[in-house]
Amino acid sequence: MNQERVVKAGLLGLGTVGSGVYKLVECQKDEMAMKAGAGLKIQKILVHNMNKKREGVDQSLLTDKWEDIMNDDEIEIVIEVMGGIEPARTMILEALHAGKNVVTANKDLVATHGHELLEAAEESGVDFLFEAAVAGAIPIIRPLKQCLAANEIQEVIGIVNGTTNFILTKLIEEGMDFDDALALATELGYAEADPTADIEGLDAGRKVAIMASIAFHSRVTFDDVYTEGITKITAKDVEYAEEFGDVIKLLGVAHNTEEGIEVAVHPMMIPKEHPLASVRDSFNAVFVRSDAAGDTMFYGRGAGELPTASAIMGDVIDVIRDIQYHCTGRISCTCYRETPVKNFKEVKNKFYIRMLVDNKPGVLAAIASVFGVHKVSIARVIQNTKEDDAAELVIVTEAVKEKHLEDALAHLVDMDTTREIGTVIREY
């Protein structure tokens, strides 16, 4: 190792995460050099607006031309924190083909084009690392790829979106309604101005696709992931979950079964004794079940300037070590299997269904008959009388295929005695 050597990097983007990376490099420069075996220098920073004032940043490093980084032979590492698919994909591919190592936090890109980028890195014998793309400061990619490599992983279940976990925590602990909790999340900076990707499960879906690909050694893309958000969860559902001894979480779920990979994001009622049930506020956690190691869980900050920068710099230090030992590209794509992803309609789940019906004789029997016709077994029923001759029914099913439950609900909607199908939530 040569601590006097300085490895030079190009930084693509100087927003929240990019600024965190720059701060860490400047503040931890000497310590990182000791850990990595060589120093690190940010040689150039690609920005969109050269005229924007940036406190604490050496303005001479800024450029708005990708070619200034791409054509600089001294730059050995490209750190991409711009986000989005393009132009990030094109830039990363060009960098990899030119023999530059790449570290990214871009979940959208990895979930959609990860296989292509890993193959390009393998062909060029360079590193393409993306620990920060899934759960911020939480190490999960490296454990799945390396630490648990001797295991057959059966399931990966995670709370991988801090915004929705914060909102659900407020619903559960403070009795807030969804809109007020979302407004608070926005005020505190947890939610974006357009929160759709968070509250509809899209952000978590991209992260689950990445984890499933690595855990099960097979290609899973975001298009394979069923996604459902938390916008329909009400205080009433939280109360029933409490009555059942459960809490409601937005979970990314990936199972490796004999019939194929099951992968989805949706709200789920989980028992309070499950490790994920106690994950509060904006924290993230990933629960992994495997044959040899058993149950393991990884917990921490899932987003933010410095937590994400921490994961990025962990990858950068790994790349510097690989450069020192001339072993870049040593961990290539591990998707050597061709396991199919199951059609989500064929996946089995237990369900909680809350509905409003006419309160008169024979209605419950008719509903039970409809469920029977569609192969849905009922585990329990709770009935509460409401005003206007209505009854609120809560039905919990045994494990049933998604398509059978969907057909049964469609049948119930057409019945004259059904006033409303309220919330449908899966149970762990």
Predicted regions: what they are:
Residues 153-157, 165-168, 172, 184, ...:
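Catalytic, metal-anchored helix/loop core of enzyme active sites in primary metabolism
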Residues 1-97:
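N-terminal glycine-/serine-/threonine-rich beta1-alpha1-beta2 phosphate-ribose binding loop
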Residues 102-103, 378:
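A short hydrophobic/small-residue beta-strand
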Residues 122-203, 210:
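Rossmann-like NAD(P)H-binding beta-loop-alpha module
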Residues 62-63, 79-80, 103-105, 128-132, ...:
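General beta-strand structural signal in soluble alpha/beta enzymes
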Residues 180-278, 283-285:
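Substrate-binding/catalytic subdomain of NAD(P)-dependent oxidoreductase enzymes
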Residues 88-98, 107-145:
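Rossmann-fold NAD(P)-binding glycine/threonine-rich loop
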Residues 316-428:
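A conserved regulatory-domain signal marking ACT and ACT-like small-molecule sensing domains
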